[in-house]
């Protein structure tokens, strides 16, 4: 039996070591395809000190018709909701990009020879002060609870994105739930646009796809390949994407501060239309009442391990803080 990768990786190992070591151990580049960009040499876990200093979220009163639309289509746009947070979040994201190895799970998803830059990173909400302030002081938690129809909003993680001018890398059609070690129906991503973005290069959503009951293999952003998952209940979305009806696609021109809410099960992606101006976004992932830990039959992203919980139980509050309770509403 081959030794595990973890037996050779030290806290100071560079991310590329993970790829090279996996090739050595498995003797196959194909075996590394389930790990593209899913590395960190920085501990993703928040410290107890940070958890104790979290602020008090502000409130948001959601429109009942907006909630109904979200529940029906799995996505909704709210204009200008977080305009006041654009500058701080841009500043935090810039530090994240300038010093990627100082933060958890940095990833560049432009294939060799491709132009531009497609950067993303996640699980740094407790390391970057602007991210911390947003998740703990903004109305995002209150907003999330209402759209999930949940009595509480538990932070799963944040996820930041930047596509630089010249990037022509499509984000492959996918939905987020199969990437995650959680399961359930009460969930939402709160995606804040940090730049003006034309509809042709914005994220596109397949309305109603969250209701299909079908899970699709996660996909690598760098080349669109499926993760290696041993789950007979999943299928490949690549078999379907050419048949999506245009009338079911939701794509919006965005301004800084505009906010998209979408279900973890809603299929979404982008075209490979060249990026002409920066496209940055800050997304937070929220868990509601019925969300529980689950063990996927393969790699997850983020690859969160040693959580100390059993399948079917809630995610631990010590790592994933509940930032909004229904009783907190005034």
PLM regions and their residue ranges:
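Non-heme Fe(II)-dependent double-stranded beta-helix
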Residues: 21, 27-72, 77-173, 179-180, ...
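Non-heme Fe(II)/2-oxoglutarate
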Residues: 31-34, 39-45, 49, 53, ...
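A short secondary-structure junction signal
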Residues: 167, 171-175, 184, 200-206, ...
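Short, conserved beta-strand element in jelly-roll/cupin
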Residues: 181-198
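Double-stranded beta-helix
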Residues: 199-267
